[in-house]
């Protein structure tokens, strides 16, 4: 099972891959961001979740503000490029990645940063995520209303917490 959430700290690929290649005597004529793009596209080409474009369009039409908090080791520019390419009509006010800010969900600091960027209080925010430990428990601990999106992955949970699921 996934255990990275226990550490709550991200080591970005832009730090790790240069070490990995240099320590093995491998020379690559690509920037760190280009390496991230190649690796991520090979590992997971990316496809929008079914219904996400309509859902984001609905939120936008109702004036509901949106942003992204992502636990990911790829460069922030690579993440933003992929999100904007796959969801070109998104209205995300910000994209926060653990690779850029060190802290991983469920660490409260990454949620606090999003609240600061949005200039909102925790009780004004609904947080939707697909990972129980990182998204649901993390946002709940930060005072946000967690909504667990269970359509992306099917993981059971054992705790008796009253949460919304979609």
Mark where each language-model region is.
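A metal-dependent, Asp-based hydrolase signature
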Residues: 1-37
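Short, exposed beta-strand "edge-strand" segments with a Pro/Gly-rich flavor and a Y/T-containing core
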Residues: 4-14, 46, 104-105, 159-166
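A structural signal for alpha-helix termini and helix-coil/disorder junctions
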Residues: 22-26, 45, 89
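Surface-exposed cleft-lining segments at the edges of enzyme active sites
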Residues: 37-46
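Asp-based, Mg2+/Mn2+-dependent phosphohydrolase catalytic module
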Residues: 53, 57-60, 67-166
